[in-house]
Amino acid sequence: MSKQLPQDFVMGGATAAYQVEGATKEDGKGRVLWDDFLDKQGRFKPDPAADFYHRYDEDLALAEKYGHQVIRVSIAWSRIFPDGAGEVEPRGVAFYHKLFADCAAHHIEPFVTLHHFDTPERLHEAGDWLSQEMLDDFVAYAKFCFEEFSEVKYWITINEPTSMAVQQYTTGTFPPAESGRFDKTFQAEHNQMVAHARIVNLYKSMQLGGQIGIVHALQTVYPYSDSAVDHHAAELQDALENRLYLDGTLAGEYHQETLALVKEILDANHQPMFQSTPQEMKAIDEAAHQLDFVGVNNYFSKWLRAYHGKSETIHNGDGTKGSSVARLQGVGEEKLPDGIETTDWDWSIYPRGMYDILMRIHNDYPLVPVTYVTENGIGLKESLPENATPDTVIEDPKRIDYVKKYLSAMADAIHDGANVKGYFIWSLQDQFSWTNGYSKRYGLFFVDFPTQNRYIKQSAEWFKSVSETHIIPD
């Protein structure tokens, strides 16, 4: 049966500066944590990505043509402050003014993220989110952006704090590529929430009239079996990846049960508890009571079973199905039940997880007034057909099927009371992936990276229909 979305529901595509812009050495842009890391790996480069730095008008024109009312973009901090602080690069400032003006020209509202995994290199070397200097410079950068880019009405402080901290210090897939350091993970998580809170409180004090939120990666965690030990493993995983953030940003405090689970993980790894101050917790509480919205990035769900060995993680970075391993000391082991479909990158396809996380926010965190689904989509191995012409439409039925199921689950959550106001598909166009390079394609628009030519995918036409009719077909 088809399902109806509210008439004021907005839809669009999502991007991130480092993944789409390219031009990493142009117009005075400073280096970021990824530049040296990717150079040393030698697997793939962030240039040209989707060359959005030069082709943003082409992509925004496509977005408008295919029914998008909104877009997620991020500001590359190192385009504004090449060193993270100090001298401003006017060419970077001018670029974002042009980008936002072009959004307006195409009748698309930008939701603008201040930090999307791209810490300036100097601040990364100073400790990244473990450094007080980083926090202070981030707040100063945010203040500059709020004053400079008054045309922006929707701000996002940080994209996926959990992904940043866990992949930097627990699984080691993001630079500095440390693993098993749960103490650093939780401290970085807390510090990100402090920075987020300071920025929310600053923005509200400036009375600029816009809205501000945060984006979380929220993958619903289920027990692998009905056993008590598997239920507890799921609770531990949830505390690591979801619960601490939800508490801090949406409740304004860390609930005692959450802290007990965090301490259990740290004790099992013989590592100390993260540090916080009363002043920091006051800022966190104040921000939670002023937050305008939360963004939910949901792609897959996890199932956890009890595990008592050493941590072992293998990241599936090339689409070899079944190659990923995730076992964390003091937490548990990820194990998919029989019958759960996965992508080539071992991400489960489980729309019920979308429903459950949206209802959890609605039921457990009533302070936040509005939710957006700020990322959802499926990465596929796709190629340009031989003899393709500019009019070629690339068939991607798997993407349509995936998005239809997740949109349907989201519509059910709206029906049951969740105040979800919009959906951003990941991604607008094919992009560069942090850990997969160019092999994993998410876009509604196919990018032939050697030529940078754009081609329409069938999913873009389907997306346009849903956006314009507000009806999710059978």
Swiss-Prot record:
The keyword Amino-acid biosynthesis does not apply. GO terms for biological process: lactose catabolic process via tagatose-6-phosphate. Its EC number is 3.2.1.85. GO terms for cellular component: cytosol. It catalyses: a 6-phospho-beta-D-galactoside + H2O = D-galactose 6-phosphate + an alcohol. SUPFAM superfamilies: (Trans)glycosidases. Pfam families: Glyco_hydro_1 (PF00232). This is 6-phospho-beta-galactosidase.
